[in-house]
Structures are given as structure tokens and as C-alpha cells.
Amino acid sequence: MNVYIYYVIFAFIISLISGAVLIPVIIKFCRKRKLYDLPDTRKVHRMMIPRLGGIAFLPSMLFAFIVSLFVLSRVLGGMEVTIGLWSCAFIVSIFIIYSVGVVDDLIGLGPKVKFLAQTLSALLLPLSGLYINNLYGFLGIWDVPFYIGAPLTVFVIVYIDNALNLIDGIDGLAGGLALMSLFGFLLCFMREGVWTYCVLISGLIGVLVAYLYFNIFCKPESNRKIFMGDSGSLTLGFVLGFLFVKFAMDNSKVMTYRSDSLLLSYTLLIVPCFDVVRVMLSRLWAGQPLFKADKRHIHHKLLRCGLSQHCALASI
């Protein structure tokens, strides 16, 4: 067995424990401060639910990543981590997105402020050298110059970030889709031998599993149920957008050339990405505002067919 797999497993366990410890603390804090997601005619839930579950995501992921590399490198050795410009840009970007999500959950922010923060955060990545530089023959296009790849990268990351945020409408949906996508990217990077990213992804998977337990299986009456809020959905979406660009980028120094990299990356995110396009086109056709919340998402349609939240989640 490859010794690096122990790093991945250890990061998952550390993050899982961290999430299991942090989330109950967050629930108590939300109830004390009365920080709830209030029900309305558009939302599915009918009781006040704490909404700050996503606060646990980034600290747990980074804690698991750092501890795994520090502890196991001393015990097992072999893994070296270099902090390059890409890494610095990602860390700064994810902290911006995470902070915006937390502030939005606490006091509320307008969509323009969040969109600006997403755009600026995404822009840091191509400025650091990480951008979509090859379409691998899609529409007959191969190599992509920076002046096209940079705005395309920003668009893709913001698009994915908002797609996951907008589909967060029933218990476990955004988290479940993100979990499957993260697991897919984990296998992709594992196959390419890019173990540093595998450890990072595993660190996010662990806390996400802990969150999904509280979100899906805990009843509101138990006072243990929680939503991820924008702090969670925006963070997850941005990480997935970053992984999309990282895996799709043609960089022989990091990974072997694969003509299906772009297609595979999109396939892992096809449900939220396709749903947001379908909803936008539907609103456009109906002459309604594109960004006004409604009940046009796929989970709303399944619920109207008589499915329960858990059945709709399983169907999607």
C-alpha cells in the first residue's frame, strides 16, 4: 500500500473528529444568540434551525491538513509540501470567501457584495498562474491564452460557487453533492499521485460527513439539527471551483496530460451546474428576474411530486 494513503485517512479522521466537536458548540452558540434560518413560503423547513454549520468547514479542513502533514511526516516521512504562489492565492481567496459567508450568515449581505467578493477571490488564482489554459479540443479549441483563460477561470469558479449555493434547498443536498464531487476529485488526484491535494480534500470530506449527520439525521425537535449557511455553501463551492481549475489545467509539471481532464471535472459537478442553468433559462423564459429566489430548482419539483426530503435527496 502506498504510504501516502495513511495521510489521507488520518486527515479524514482528524477532520471528522474536529467537525463532531465543533458543530455541537456552534449549535449551542446559535441557540444562545438566536441565529436561526427562519421558515417562509419558499423554504422547505417549518421550524427555526441554526444556520452556521459551515463555520466548522474551513478550520477543520486546515487543521486536519496541517496536523496530518506534521505528524505523519515525522512518523512516516516521505511527503514534502512546497508553498507556492498558487497555494498562497488559494489560502487568501478561501479566507475571503469564508469570511464573507460568515458575515452574511450573521448580519446579512447583499448579492452584489457577495458577487464582488467571489469575483475578486477567483481573480487571485489566475493572477497567481492557475487558470484554464487548455480546452482539450472542446469546440475545436486547444491551447487557451492567458487573456482568455483568466476571465474564463474567474467565470467558472464564480459559476460553480453560486451553483452549489443556490441548490442548497433541502437537507443534505448541497453537502451530499459536494461530498460526491470531493470524493471524485480525491480519486482523480490520487490516480495522478498529487497527494497534497488528496490530503486537503480528505480534510474537507471528514468535516462534511460530520455536518451531514447533524443536518440529515438529527430532527429539529432534538435541538441538534443545523444548516451550513452561506459560510458553508460558499466555501464548499469555491473549493470545488478551485479543484475544477486545478485538475483541468494542462500542467505537465504536476500531472500527466489527459485529454478528458476538462470533461471529467465538469462531470463531477454536473448536477448543480446544470440545475442553475436550467433555472436561469426558465426564469428568463417566464420574464422573471434572474436572481430572484423561487421554487424552480430540481428538488422543488421532486417535492411537488410528493417525495419526502430524504427521497428527493436520494433521487438527485
How would you label these PLM feature ranges?
Residues 84-120, 125:
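Hydrophobic alpha-helical hairpins/lids featuring a short glycine-rich hinge
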Residues 50-70, 123-127:
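A generic, lipid-embedded transmembrane alpha helix
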Residues 88, 143-153, 260:
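Membrane-interfacial loop-to-helix junctions in multi-pass transporters
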Residues 17, 41-45, 73-83, 132-142, ...:
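Short juxtamembrane and helix-loop transition motifs at transmembrane-helix boundaries
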Residues 38-52, 224-229:
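Juxtamembrane helix-capping/reentrant segments at transmembrane boundaries
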Residues 2-28, 32-34, 61-73, 79-95, ...:
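Alpha-helical transmembrane segments
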Residues 151-161, 173-174:
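Function-critical hydrophobic alpha-helical transmembrane segments in multi-pass membrane proteins
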Residues 103-111, 165-173, 221-223:
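Membrane-helix interface "capping/anchor" motifs
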